[in-house]
């Protein structure tokens, strides 16, 4: 079907991948399309309750590039005072799919992105996409077991099996606060893989202290030093074999040392803030 791109909406379920594409990426794709044409049709489904309107299922990068081409053509007409004509990119051939469940639509989006984008460079996006894909394959109409869903993920993704297993473990088994600090890039993936070796209670206790460190002034040397010291201590707790009593003793001491250092850093921050305030009067 030939559809006007103004009648096609972006899919909110694709928001996870949207940040991976820069304006420069879209501009390069637009140049390719202008030169070689649209090699792959957009895939859309009818928008319920809105006759003639569609929602995108596959091809968001292409849709954004087409919009850019239309904009460029319009600008050229205005600058050169040419007759106002519809851009050749305003209407494009689309594949229209019908009768998919909401879950099937999301699985379609994730499957396409996990295949086409290869090894997604953004750790958070890759991890969240992999987890969503596996979770949705366990729902109707697929109803796969967790093991079957994970196998299906490994078949569509070019990432190696260990990377996928670790990503799913971080998304499903890591303390939510630690995972949020990873998403915010305060912690890194290797560190969080280590924290999976801690018990859930230990993870929660460590997370509470890491949150306090993250709240310190990002520009301060102390923030980085305290974080590095606690990271090293947590690695030691996670990896070294000790009796339960000795492990708890080492773990508690590491948290206390970090708490003390945080207190000192806050005192320094407050003093610096007071000096700045005095200078401003």
Task: List the model feature ranges, each with a label.
Residues 1-95:
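Short, charged/polar connector segments at secondary-structure boundaries
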Residues 132-136, 161-280:
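Amphipathic alpha-helical extensions and coiled-coil-like segments
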């Amino acid at each position: 079907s030939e559809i006007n791109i103004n009648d096609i909406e972006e899919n909110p379920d694709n928001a996870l991948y949207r940040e991976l594409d820069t304006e420069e990426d879209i501009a390069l794709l637009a140049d390719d399309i202008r030169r070689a044409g649209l090699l792959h049709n957009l895939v859309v489904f009818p928008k319920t309750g809105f006759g003639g309107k569609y929602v995108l299922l596959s091809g968001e990068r292409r849709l954004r590039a087409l919009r850019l081409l239309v904009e460029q053509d319009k600008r050229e007409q205005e600058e050169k005072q040419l007759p106002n004509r519809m851009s050749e990119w305003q209407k494009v051939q689309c594949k229209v799919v019908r009768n998919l469940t909401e879950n099937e639509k999301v699985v379609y989006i994730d499957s396409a992105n996990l295949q086409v984008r290869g090894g997604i460079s953004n750790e958070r996006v890759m991890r969240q996409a992999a987890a969503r894909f596996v979770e949705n394959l366990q729902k109707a109409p697929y109803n796969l077991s967790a093991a079957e869903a994970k196998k299906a993920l490994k078949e569509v993704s070019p990432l190696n099996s260990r990377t996928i297993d670790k990503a799913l473990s971080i998304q499903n088994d890591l303390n939510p606060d630690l995972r949020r600090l990873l998403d915010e890039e305060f912690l890194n993936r290797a560190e969080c893989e280590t924290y999976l070796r801690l018990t859930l209670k230990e993870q929660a206790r460590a997370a509470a202290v890491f949150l306090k460190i993250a709240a310190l002034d990002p520009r301060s040397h102390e923030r980085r030093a305290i974080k590095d010291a606690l990271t090293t201590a947590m690695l030691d707790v996670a990896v070294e074999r000790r009796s339960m009593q000795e492990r708890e003793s080492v773990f508690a001491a590491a948290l206390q040392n970090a708490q003390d250092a945080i207190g000192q850093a806050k005192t320094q921050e407050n003093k610096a803030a007071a000096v700045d305030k005095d200078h401003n009067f």
